[in-house]
């Protein structure tokens, strides 16, 4: 038994170190609370998505507020030639708090030609847990949990960033959970510039984006599929996402605003 004690000690140290606050936690900027920029009103936004300049998908996004609760819904899928090659229909819903800009739950349904994928993410003050259910399934779904807070969804991360002053050189660092994984996201404010969206030239705030993967032991890993990213937020009273580009392992992908209806209600 005494011979085994050193092994137990090593295992104990390994587990203890995994549960300690990770070194990167000191870089997270969300402890200061939300900024003072007003929260957006109810709205409908339409985006087109593509790869290397070619439109491949479209989605409608609805933002609805009721008291302190905020519901963000997105519905879309592949279009045109891309749909013939790769069929995808997506429904996404996020519930969050307006006061804290923190999410409570995300449910996402992805319907492909040969399978359906449902991802449920639950956020709490202790951690975040996700379950991905694939149909037809080869094995039962397994949950994934990270014990860290606060954690944002993609849309609430945007709410957080837009609430801040967004002065040139400012950096916002936060933990974002999307699909079935966690990431350390860094958003750096590059400055103000103009960008053409459709036929209109818009005043915009340019940001640079960086992501690192976070494993279940809160260790940072290189996100191999993502090389670099950038985005443009409208420099006005709305601060809506105008365009996002990401350099990935097969070129670059983008999302661009096609239509914005402030005050619109979901039909």
Where do the PLM segments sit?
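Compositionally biased, intrinsically disordered low-complexity regions enriched in proline and serine
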Residues: 8-9, 48, 159, 178
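Hydrophobic, well-structured mid-protein blocks that either form specific transmembrane helices
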Residues: 119-164
């Amino acid at each position: 038994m005494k011979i085994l004690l050193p092994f137990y000690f090593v295992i104990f140290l390994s587990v203890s170190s995994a549960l300690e606050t990770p070194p990167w936690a000191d870089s997270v900027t969300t402890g200061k609370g939300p900024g003072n920029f007003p929260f957006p009103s109810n709205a409908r936004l339409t985006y087109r998505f593509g790869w290397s300049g070619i439109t491949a998908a479209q989605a409608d996004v609805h933002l609805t507020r009721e008291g302190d609760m905020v519901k963000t819904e997105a519905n879309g899928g592949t279009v045109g030639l891309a749909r013939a090659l790769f069929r995808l229909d997506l429904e996404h819903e996020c519930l969050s708090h307006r006061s804290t800009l923190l999410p409570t739950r995300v449910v996402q349904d992805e319907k492909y030609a040969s399978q359906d994928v449902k991802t449920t993410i639950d956020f709490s003050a202790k951690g975040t847990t996700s379950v991905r259910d694939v149909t037809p399934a080869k094995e039962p779904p397994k949950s994934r949990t990270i014990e860290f807070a606060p954690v944002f969804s993609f849309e609430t991360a945007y709410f957080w960033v837009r609430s801040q002053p967004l002065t040139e050189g400012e950096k916002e660092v936060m933990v974002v959970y999307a699909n079935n994984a966690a990431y350390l996201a860094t958003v750096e404010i590059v400055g103000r510039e103009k960008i053409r969206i459709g036929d209109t030239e818009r005043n915009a705030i340019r940001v640079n984006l960086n992501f690192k993967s976070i494993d279940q032991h809160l260790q940072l890993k290189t996100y191999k599929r993502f090389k670099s990213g950038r985005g443009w937020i409208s420099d006005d009273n709305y601060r809506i996402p105008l365009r996002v580009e990401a350099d990935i392992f097969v070129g670059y992908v983008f999302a661009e605003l096609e239509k914005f209806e402030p005050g619109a209600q979901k039909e």
